[in-house]
From Swiss-Prot:
The active site is at residue 127. This is Transaldolase. The keyword Metal-binding does not apply. GO terms for molecular function: transaldolase activity. It catalyses: D-sedoheptulose 7-phosphate + D-glyceraldehyde 3-phosphate = D-erythrose 4-phosphate + beta-D-fructose 6-phosphate. It is an enzyme of class 2 (transferase).
Length: 316
């Protein structure tokens, strides 16, 4: 299925040197993503960073973080470069800008350009959150020919707006990361059983339609947050359900490994808009609104990445 790509949503030094290479070499994945929470988990819990951290003692916390993170990003970039050289739509690794800059467009643009210039790799995507000021950042980076991963996308309306900006201005590869499973985690406790474990897929599918109205060969929907939050669901539930044409799924290792045991052989047909609208109407009958939920989840996502980044910096 050439129009569906599987990426890995995980980064850690030992993994990059071993299992990451195996996944690439056997054709299981063709890209990867990182975020502040993943780096916090890796750097604070893995023994593979400790010697380097000791050598960097005395430097500012953010400088230590960037030294460690950029080394990992470069390593991932090198491993993925053959895929990029074969097909410039694949072979990317993403690095997020400082989450504390999300409400300052000018500083975000400056940091994004600095990081991209420092890394000096064509297959590095700079991640920008879909916040209010993020739209200005996306536009500026697109015009500067920087590959972009727009993250924390929950709202179909915002997904469409971002796709419209990128369709006009993107000169390099761009993906719009639609977060999936967090919807079900938020909504399922409030919804009757017959409506559970569906909100994330319904919302993601509507985002997919919005993105594809403007998508071109440079722009794709990327489904993120595709690890399950419920033990009642198969580990690869969201990967299989959202296996659409012209889409990417970035998955945590547990979901990825489960999917690889029994991968899809055909694309899924997305639900029709009429079916999605009928589902949303049923939710509203239970006082649940997906757009309001999307706004809430964006705020929570921005806070969570700041908390992870702060925890990581304070660990130094």
């Amino acid at each position: 299925m050439q129009e569906f790509s599987l990426w890995c949503d995980f980064i850690e030094r030992d993994f990059l040197e071993n299992d990451f290479l195996k996944l690439i070499n056997k054709g299981a994945i063709c890209g990867a993503t990182s975020n502040p929470s993943l780096f916090c988990e890796a750097i604070t819990k893995s023994a593979f960073y400790q010697d380097e951290i000791a050598k960097l003692k005395g430097k500012k916390a953010k400088e230590i973080y960037e030294t460690l993170a950029l080394k990992d990003i470069l390593q991932a970039s090198s491993a993925l470069m053959p895929l990029y050289e074969k097909d410039p739509n694949n072979g990317y690794i993403s690095l997020e800008i400082d989450p504390f800059l999300e409400d300052d467009a000018i500083k975000s643009i400056d940091e994004a350009k600095r990081l991209f210039k420092t890394l000096n790799r064509p297959n590095v995507m700079i991640k920008v959150p879909a916040s209010e000021s993020g739209l200005e950042v996306i536009s500026a980076l697109a015009q500067a020919s920087i590959p972009i991963n727009v993250t924390l996308v929950f709202s179909p309306k915002i997904a469409g707006e971002i796709a419209q900006i990128l369709a006009k201005e993107a000169q390099k590869r761009a993906v719009i990361s639609v977060f999936v499973s967090r919807f079900d985690k938020e909504i399922d406790p409030l919804a009757p059983q017959n409506l559970q474990a569906q909100s994330g897929i319904m919302n993601a599918t509507e985002c997919y339609y919005q993105i594809n109205q403007h998508a071109n060969k440079l722009i794709s929907a990327l489904f993120a947050s595709t690890g399950v939050k419920s033990n009642a669901l198969a580990k690869d539930y969201y990967i299989k359900a959202l296996c659409f044409k012209n889409s990417i799924n970035t998955a945590p290792l547990e979901a990825l490994n489960a999917y690889l045991l029994d991968p899809n052989t055909e694309y899924q047909t997305p639900l029709k808009i009429t079916e999605i609208e009928a589902f949303k109407k049923e939710l509203k009958a239970h006082n649940i609104d997906l757009e309001n939920t999307a706004q809430k989840l964006l705020k929570e996502g921005l806070i969570a990445f700041k908390q992870s980044f702060e925890k990581l910096l304070s660990s130094f």
